[in-house]
A protein has these predicted regions:
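Single conserved hydrophobic/aromatic residue that forms the stacking wall/gate
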Residues: 1-13
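A generic fold-level signal
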Residues: 2, 23, 40, 52-53
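Single, functionally critical "micro-switch" positions that shape active/binding sites
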Residues: 3, 31, 38, 43, ...
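Short N-terminal edge-element motif at the start of the domain
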Residues: 12, 18-19
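Conserved kinase catalytic-core helix
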Residues: 19-40
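C-terminal catalytic region of ATP-dependent kinase domains
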Residues: 20, 36, 52-155
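Hydrophobic residue at the +6 position relative to the catalytic HRD Asp in the kinase catalytic loop
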Residues: 45-47
Length: 155
């Protein structure tokens, strides 16, 4: 298994010419942990290729499963958000967001900082008036909770 993974990494690097995969994955894991995106998997980790065959890392995409957004089945509105936050499981390398983020940061360093403030969050959430007030408040509380948990990610 380790040999197979090492070989896959060598093939990937030689095909794309990109050699900062660890940092890229670490950024994805940071975003996923912070926003509680439980649906990161190998089909939404990608690279882009232009018409000349040059590759670059893909912008982060497919975060629709974040912020306890499945309110019909997994994370009902009437349940305690702090309890649900503690129960969210990642689907990428480990089921534990903190465990996979710790491993990635230990291997590749912390290479992502967030620059937004609680006021920024409040302003954005309050302006999202297409959503009901209780959903907006829930998102705000989730993000505030994550900001407190991951203080080291903010400048």
């Amino acid at each position: 298994e380790p040999y197979r993974r090492q070989r896959q990494m060598c093939i990937r690097d030689s095909i794309t010419g990109l050699n900062n995969w660890g940092e890229y994955i670490c950024r994805l894991f940071t975003i996923d942990a912070f926003f509680l995106n439980e649906d990161r998997h190998m089909h939404n980790i990608a690279v882009l290729m232009n018409g000349k065959g040059d590759y670059k890392y893909c912008p982060v995409f497919d975060n629709g499963a974040g912020l306890l957004s499945d309110t019909t089945m997994d994370y009902p509105m009437e349940q305690d958000i702090y309890q649900m936050i503690s129960e969210v499981k990642s689907k990428s390398v480990s089921q534990n967001f903190d465990e996979q983020l710790d491993v990635a940061e230990n291997l590749y360093g912390q290479n992502l900082q967030f620059l937004f403030t609680k006021k920024n969050v409040s302003d954005i959430v309050n302006n999202a008036d297409t959503y009901p007030p209780e959903e907006r408040k829930r998102v705000e509380l989730i993000i505030y909770s994550q900001m407190n948990k991951y203080k080291y990610l903010f400048r």
